[in-house]
């Protein structure tokens, strides 16, 4: 394999001159540049990104660690991250954890060995333990939630407000018998959305029915199991707040398999406003998280941290909005 020394010897220049030509880091005459680049082509020389990073202290590469790429919410956020990385001439390496702590640690090590300039973390799975040893010395941005404290910038969404808005939309449609299917309540986002639900009921002077609070998971199966639990009760709610759109999709399937109609028999409110939500039958009312904005803001914040590593850490909060479609039946 050809090296810079080989190129320098054949071009009869110093290795530093070869480096300046390849990296464009200093003026070199056109004659020398053409000579060096001709030899580079003849030897089929490809400079190592890692080797170059040792000189310039950057690889123009960001790592993204995410729970799963097949979750629609994560997928849409990742699209925003990738788009903004490309706009800033950064490469993106994506690794998944699948909810496995060992895989989390292995992928973190892999990303650090690839000399990424910084990391985006979007994999705060509740199955991870807070005592997992993570020696991360890179610039970090935590997106949405993480299972332990880190020295990092954080981008969160106001999930308590989102839970309140979701429940209030059902109350405004005349519903007073409102259930909720949460994600795993070890996650702060699930806790906060539940608190928002409770706040809206309290404000409307609606008694809380603990049997209508079903803890589940932020996935399709979580919605199926959650609705099955609510439908087996002797007293059923007329509306259900699903704490993610993936839960709502599972709920749709379970409701329709029971021969029930949405929204006539059971109104459904989702959370996240994934692209699929508008294409469900009926289209899903939901709480919109600005996913593209989240992706863009995460990259902007990480690049700022890479550039200014000694700045104080920041916590940025995104505000959700309510999107009303056709999955809520008016009882008024």
From Swiss-Prot:
The keyword Transcription regulation applies. SMART domains: HTH_LACI. PROSITE patterns: HTH_LACI_1, HTH_LACI_2. GO terms for molecular function: DNA-binding transcription factor activity; transcription cis-regulatory region binding. The keyword Transmembrane does not apply. Keywords: DNA-binding, Repressor, Transcription, Transcription regulation. Gene3D superfamilies: 3.40.50.2300, lambda repressor-like DNA-binding domains (1.10.260.40). Pfam families: LacI, Peripla_BP_3. Residues 4-23 bind DNA. Residues 2-56 form the HTH lacI-type domain. It comes from the Bacteria. PANTHER family: LACI-RELATED TRANSCRIPTIONAL REPRESSOR, RIBOSE OPERON REPRESSOR. Transcriptional repressor for the ribose rbsDACBK operon. This is Ribose operon repressor. The gene is rbsR.
């Amino acid at each position: 394999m050809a090296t810079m020394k080989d190129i320098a010897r054949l071009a009869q220049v110093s290795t530093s001159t070869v480096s300046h030509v390849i990296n464009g880091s200093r003026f070199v005459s056109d004659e020398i540049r053409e000579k060096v680049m001709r030899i580079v082509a003849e030897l089929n020389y490809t400079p190592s990104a890692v080797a170059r990073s040792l000189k310039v202290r950057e690889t123009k590469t960001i790592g993204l660690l995410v729970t799963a790429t097949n979750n629609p919410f994560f997928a849409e956020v990742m699209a925003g991250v990738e788009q903004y990385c490309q706009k800033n001439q950064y490469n993106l390496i994506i690794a998944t954890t699948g909810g496995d702590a060992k895989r989390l640690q292995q992928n973190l090590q892999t990303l650090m060995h690839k000399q990424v300039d910084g990391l985006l973390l979007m994999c705060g799975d509740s199955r991870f333990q807070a005592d997992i040893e993570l020696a991360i010395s890179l610039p970090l941005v935590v997106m949405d939630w993480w299972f332990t404290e880190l020295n990092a910038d954080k981008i969160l969404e106001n999930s308590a407000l989102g839970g309140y808005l979701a429940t209030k939309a059902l109350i405004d449609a005349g519903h007073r018998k409102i259930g909720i299917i949460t994600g795993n309540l070890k996650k702060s986002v699930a806790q906060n959305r539940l608190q928002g639900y409770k706040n809206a009921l309290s404000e409307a002077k609606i008694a809380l029915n603990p049997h209508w609070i079903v803890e589940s998971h932020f996935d399709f199966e979580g919605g199926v199991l959650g609705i099955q639990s609510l439908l087996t009760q002797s007293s059923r709610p007329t509306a259900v707040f699903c704490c993610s759109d993936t839960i709502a999709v599972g709920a749709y399937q379970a409701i329709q398999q029971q021969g029930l109609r949405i929204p006539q028999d059971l109104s459904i409110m989702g959370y996240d406003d994934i692209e699929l939500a508008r294409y469900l039958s009926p289209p899903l009312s939901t709480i919109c998280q600005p996913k593209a904005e989240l992706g863009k803001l995460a990259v902007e914040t990480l690049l700022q941290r890479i550039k200014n590593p000694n700045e104080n850490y920041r916590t940025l909060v995104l505000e959700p909005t309510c999107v009303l479609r056709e999955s809520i039946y008016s009882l008024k």
